Regions:
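A short helix-loop-beta-strand connector motif used in the catalytic cores of GNAT acetyltransferases and
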Residues: 77-87, 110, 263
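Conserved N-terminal entry element of GNAT/NAT acetyltransferase domains
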Residues: 2-43
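Acyl-donor binding region in acyl/amide transferases
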Residues: 107-262
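A broad, structural surface signal
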Residues: 50, 54-61, 168, 172-175, ...
Length: 263
């Protein structure tokens, strides 16, 4: 680890991790690479949570983000009604590969202060329609990560399936939470991302997926050229797939890629 990342805690003892990754927390095997998918939380697996916090901080810091703390763990990870952690674990490597944190929103809606439980409520205003008609059937997703050693640029063989493995886990959530109809969350784009590429990406999303009902609105809207007339003219009238190809080329020409959660 470089000196710039030396503030991050060392790896958690593997014996402690294995002791907490018990069969009752195993959800399924992945379709590729035969990895394991677990659901854990701070209360039933504190050592696994600590390793997740270490890997999140390492991953985000190496991408230009990070909290600057020894672990990326906040009060929503440790609260009484805490976020659960969906993780992919490689038995072959004895490593946690990737993860999401998630909260079944129906768990907190009976609390008058339910918005304090939701990470996204810090960033967005929710309409009554969204709260009443969507949240009871929604899982909030956040903190999506793939540790650096399993990203395609570092490990082409295993990295190609890292996100695919994690999405196997999302499929499992649909099975285990039968009332859920929606996944919801935010995508982080760091300030280092090329602004022209960012503006094109946001214009693309607004063009094909407008929030005409005002379900969710940002508390601090990003100031950017929403009209982005030149790019909109390029995609206007195109089918989604063709417009996406154009977007991908536009972004690549600026030495960026479309974020995996949008790809």
């Amino acid at each position: 680890m470089s000196n710039e990342l030396s503030y991050i805690i060392p790896p958690v003892d593997r014996d402690l991790l294995r002791s907490e990754l018990s069969n009752d927390k195993l959800i399924r095997k992945t379709n590729k690479l035969n990895n394991d998918i677990y659901i854990v939380n701070h209360h039933n697996s504190p050592n696994v949570m600590r390793e997740i916090g270490r890997l999140r901080e390492l991953t985000f810091a190496m991408s230009g983000g990070g909290t600057g703390n020894p672990v990326d763990i906040d009060e929503r990870d440790t609260a009484e009604i805490c976020y659960d952690q969906l993780i992919v674990y490689s038995p072959e490597d004895d490593e946690i590969v990737s993860g999401y944190r998630f909260l079944d929103c129906s768990k907190v809606l009976d609390d008058d202060r339910f918005k304090t439980h939701l990470s996204t409520a810090h960033y967005f205003n929710f309409s009554d329609h969204f709260v009443n008609e969507y949240l009871p059937y929604t899982i909030e997703l956040g903190r999506s990560w793939v540790q650096p050693a399993y990203q395609p640029s570092q490990n082409p063989r295993k990295g190609i399936f890292a996100l695919d493995n994690l999405w196997d886990g999302l499929g499992a959530l649909v099975i285990t939470h039968k009332h859920v109809e929606h996944f919801y969350g935010k995508v982080t784009m760091y300030p280092t991302y090329d602004k022209e590429a960012r503006n094109a990406l946001l214009s693309f999303m607004h063009y094909f997926f407008p929030d005409n009902d005002g379900l969710v609105t940002p508390k601090n809207p990003l100031v950017y050229n929403q009209n982005n007339a030149k790019f909109i003219r390029m995609i206007k009238g195109l089918e989604y797939k063709e417009a996406y190809k154009l977007l991908s080329r536009f972004v690549k020409a600026r030495e960026e890629t479309v974020p995996p959660l949008i790809n």
